[in-house]
């Protein structure tokens, strides 16, 4: 574990009572957070407006000179409450679709990492690199049992091996599964890809800062579903090349 060896502790992990996103490390996740914040601003305005209208109606209902039982039709208000929500939904949907398609784009990846989900661990393969035996770099990653955890390691998140990636590099993740449906999800990187048997799904990531990033399988896949974490160490290009030479 390169970052631990260098006494560098940069972990992006869930926090107790956390109600917001983890710090973003990719443009995709930055876009997701920005879209969420912008939409939430307008949703709060809508909530306050609707709440005020409801409160006013209930408060002043007894003073209304026109009893509601005689009001059976109101074309103007019906047009307003039909068109206005539709316009709001379109305004929300337009940037959402743009971000969705941008997140699906894989732009000239410099390297590819394959992630295969199995019950209940992950297998990784660096298909662009070959070791001294003429084989691609491949390893399996298992969760560290609670009784074997060392100081600083996280329960149900730390693994015996880590995916090591260089910083500021376009990386393509190809995700699949060998048995049942899993889900490759790393919140800080804005990655969440379904791992389906017999199908290859892909996503790209440009990780912009060094650190240790954790994720969990986000698809119920059996009794040990909670024991399928993923751990990614992002290091400098020099440290990544050193790690490659050791494989």
UniProtKB/Swiss-Prot annotation:
Principal location class: mitochondrion
Its job: Component of the cytochrome c oxidase, the last enzyme in the mitochondrial electron transport chain which drives oxidative phosphorylation. The respiratory chain contains 3 multisubunit complexes succinate dehydrogenase (complex II, CII), ubiquinol-cytochrome c oxidoreductase (cytochrome b-c1 complex, complex III, CIII) and cytochrome c oxidase (complex IV, CIV), that cooperate to transfer electrons derived from NADH and succinate to molecular oxygen, creating an electrochemical gradient over the inner membrane that drives transmembrane transport and the ATP synthase.
Record membrane topology: Multi-pass membrane protein
Protein's name in the database: Cytochrome c oxidase subunit 2
Chain ranges passing through the membrane: 39-59, 79-101
Subunit structure: Component of the cytochrome c oxidase (complex IV, CIV), a multisubunit enzyme composed of a catalytic core of 3 subunits and several supernumerary subunits. The complex exists as a monomer or a dimer and forms supercomplexes (SCs) in the inner mitochondrial membrane with ubiquinol-cytochrome c oxidoreductase (cytochrome b-c1 complex, complex III, CIII).
Cell compartment(s), UniProt: Mitochondrion inner membrane
Topology, Mitochondrial matrix side: 60-78
Keyword field: Copper, Electron transport, Magnesium, Membrane, Metal-binding, Mitochondrion, Mitochondrion inner membrane, Respiratory chain, Translocase, Transmembrane, Transmembrane helix, Transport
One GO cellular component term: mitochondrial inner membrane
InterPro entries assigned: CcO_II (IPR045187), CcO_II-like_C (IPR002429), CcO_II_C (IPR034210), Copper_CuA (IPR001505), Cupredoxin (IPR008972), Cyt_c_oxidase_su2_TM_dom (IPR011759), Cyt_c_oxidase_su2_TM_sf (IPR036257)
Domain of life where this protein originates: Eukaryota
Reactions that this protein is recorded to catalyse: 4 Fe(II)-[cytochrome c] + O2 + 8 H(+)(in) = 4 Fe(III)-[cytochrome c] + 2 H2O + 4 H(+)(out)
């Amino acid at each position: 574990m390169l970052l631990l060896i260098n006494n560098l502790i940069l972990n992006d992990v869930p926090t107790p009572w956390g109600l917001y996103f983890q710090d973003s490390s990719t443009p995709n996740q930055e876009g997701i957070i920005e879209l969420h914040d912008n939409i939430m601003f307008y949703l709060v305005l809508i909530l306050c407006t609707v709440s005020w209208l409801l409160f006013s109606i209930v408060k002043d209902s007894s003073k209304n000179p026109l009893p509601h039982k005689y009001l059976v039709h109101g074309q103007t208000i019906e047009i307003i409450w039909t068109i206005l929500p539709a316009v709001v939904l379109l305004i929300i949907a337009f940037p959402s679709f743009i971000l969705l398609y941008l997140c699906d784009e894989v732009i000239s990846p410099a390297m590819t990492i394959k992630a295969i989900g199995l019950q209940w661990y992950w297998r990784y393969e660096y298909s662009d690199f070959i070791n001294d035996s003429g084989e691609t770099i491949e390893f399996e990653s298992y969760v560290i049992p609670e009784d074997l955890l060392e100081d600083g390691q996280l329960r149900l998140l730390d693994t015996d091996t880590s995916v090591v990636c260089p910083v500021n590099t376009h990386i393509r993740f190809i995700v699949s599964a060998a048995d049942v449906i899993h889900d490759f999800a790393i919140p800080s990187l804005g990655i969440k890809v379904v791992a389906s048997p017999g199908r290859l799904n892909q996503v790209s990531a440009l990780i912009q800062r060094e650190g240790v990033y954790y994720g969990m399988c986000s698809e119920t896949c059996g009794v040990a579903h909670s024991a399928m974490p993923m751990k990614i160490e992002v290091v400098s290009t020099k440290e990544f090349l050193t790690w490659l030479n050791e494989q």
